[in-house]
Amino acid sequence: MPIGRALAAGTLALLAAPALALEPPVNAGAAFLEAFEAACVPQRQSFEGTKANAVAEGWVAVGDDHHPELAALLEKSRAEMTDPDYPEWHGILAPYAQDIDGRPPYLIVLHFIAPGTANYIGCYLYDFDALDVIDPQLVTAFTGNPIARQSDQDGVKSYLWGPPPGLPGTGDVYLAHIADDSTTVAITGFSGLAIKFDTYEPGSGKGD
């Protein structure tokens, strides 16, 4: 089981398609990206630190049943993190909610523990009600990298940027929007907007 397939599985699948030129998005999304940066960047190398930082930024811990798409996403993610070939590998998911500019996004912080290889902390922000992807140039400015891959197929717009040079240990940054009628919803458990990155945990292997 490859590391990172848990919450990333659906998004990675979106980015496997050939690169296509995309039209400018309707939603500029600065507030969404700012919320992601504020919650995910400062303590990204620590699971407990990221959770504490999220609370300091106004996020409130919620249960799986806070939103049906959150419940479906978490259920699928937990299933992806269970593999009989790697019984010691496991993940801990911490979901949070907050109102941002009148919208109800959800933050998920992941601690994936993989003895024998490397642990990582994932930070994922979702807006299940978003109608379009945010302006990808905002993410280009955030990462300091050009878009490495993009696609627009089956109601899914997706983008990938390489590891941000200013964030040591952090991997690729993914951005995607999934339309309500996309067949990808059956894979991900949700429609709407998502942005994410994973950071290797210091002292656990790769990324030390």
What are these regions (language model features)?
Residues 22-52, 112-136:
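Terminal, regulation- and interaction-focused segments at domain boundaries
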Residues 1-10:
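Bacterial N-terminal signal peptides that target proteins for export
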